[in-house]
Curated annotation (Swiss-Prot):
GO cellular component, one term: cytosolic small ribosomal subunit
Alphabetical list of HAMAP family matching this protein: Ribosomal_uS2_B (MF_00291_B)
Organism of this sequence: Helicobacter pylori (strain P12)
GO MF: structural constituent of ribosome
Family according to the record: Belongs to the universal ribosomal protein uS2 family.
Alphabetical list of Pfam families matching this protein: Ribosomal_S2
Database matches in InterPro entries: Ribosomal_uS2 (IPR001865), Ribosomal_uS2_bac/mit/plastid (IPR005706), Ribosomal_uS2_CS (IPR018130), Ribosomal_uS2_flav_dom_sf (IPR023591)
Matches recorded under NCBIfam families: rpsB_bact
GO BP, sorted A to Z: translation
Protein name, per record: Small ribosomal subunit protein uS2
Keywords (A to Z) from UniProt: Ribonucleoprotein, Ribosomal protein
Range of residues in the leader sequence: none
PANTHER family linked: 30S RIBOSOMAL PROTEIN S2 PROKARYOTIC AND ORGANELLAR, SMALL RIBOSOMAL SUBUNIT PROTEIN US2M
């Protein structure tokens, strides 16, 4: 789990210029240095650990979590961690309706799958060069926008967002559907939009990497807990069944004994 040293080394305490702040973040600010707001890392650490547990527990309950972060500093890092733990993600551009009109998004994913099937079967080679080029361009575009959500069969139970100010459409859709939002909260962000905020820098690459890493580890830990629960439940089930059969045999023996004694 994250430490104060991690937060300092990754520059999580650096907020935005004072003229760009959101007054609602005042409670998370420690002070000002060279016109830059400094975030209170004691509060960051407390919120970080609390949110880590929230995400871990959600994962342990089998809930799905989507990663969202499309800005330049975040997109590659977010994709790396999302793919490493096999969760859906959006790292290029958020398409309107990705949550609120999910059925349409699924249709677009299906188009991508059909084009890939055409490639694999060789059917695409039967087209003219112009037609083939157009279809391959379509595939490239679909994969860029939807590659991270192509295996997502339903809307997520929670979303983890890098920069809620930039990802305002994703945040608005999640709030409309009452999907909990987890996010680092920089000094220019509105804390009222985030269910589980972590006060911190959402612009520096090292800080973003730390947030992605910790949320990924929370999800993995939750999966391990869920697996342990399943194994434990199976063991208990087998034990109960064994004891139950033994009791039945003992009762049957007693009944047979009573019958024999009665016959005598």
């Amino acid at each position: 789990m994250v430490t104060m040293k991690d937060l300092l080394e990754c520059g999580v305490h650096f907020g935005h210029q004072t003229r760009r702040w959101n007054p609602k973040t005042k409670k998370f600010i420690f002070g000002v240095r060279k016109n830059i707001h400094i975030i209170d890392l004691q509060k960051t650490l407390r919120y970080f650990r609390y949110t880590y547990n929230i995400v871990r527990d959600a994962s342990a309950q089998g809930k799905s979590i989507m990663f969202v972060g499309t800005k330049k500093q975040a997109n590659e890092t977010l994709k790396e961690f999302a793919e490493s733990i096999q969760v859906p993600y959006v790292n290029y551009r958020w398409l309107g309706g990705m949550l609120t009109n999910f059925s349409t998004i699924r249709k677009s994913v299906r188009k991508l799958e059909i084009i890939e099937e055409m490639e694999n079967s060789g059917q695409i080679d039967l087209l003219t060069k112009k037609e083939k080029l157009m279809i391959l361009r379509k595939k490239e575009k679909l994969d860029k926008y939807l590659g991270g959500v192509r295996h997502m069969k339903k809307i997520p139970d929670m979303i983890f967002v890098i920069d809620v100010a930039k990802e305002k459409i994703a945040v608005a859709e999640a709030r409309k559907l009452h999907i909990p939002i987890v996010a680092p909260l920089d000094t220019n962000c509105d804390p009222d939009l985030v269910d589980y905020p972590i006060p911190g820098n959402d612009d520096a690459i090292r800080s973003i990497r730390l947030f992605c890493k910790e949320m990924s580890e929370a999800i993995l830990e939750g999966r391990e807990l869920m697996q342990e629960e399943i194994v434990h439940a199976d063991e208990n089930s087998e034990e109960i069944e064994f004891v139950s059969n033994e009791e039945k045999e003992e009762m049957l023996a007693e009944i047979q004994k009573e019958i024999t004694q009665g016959a005598e």
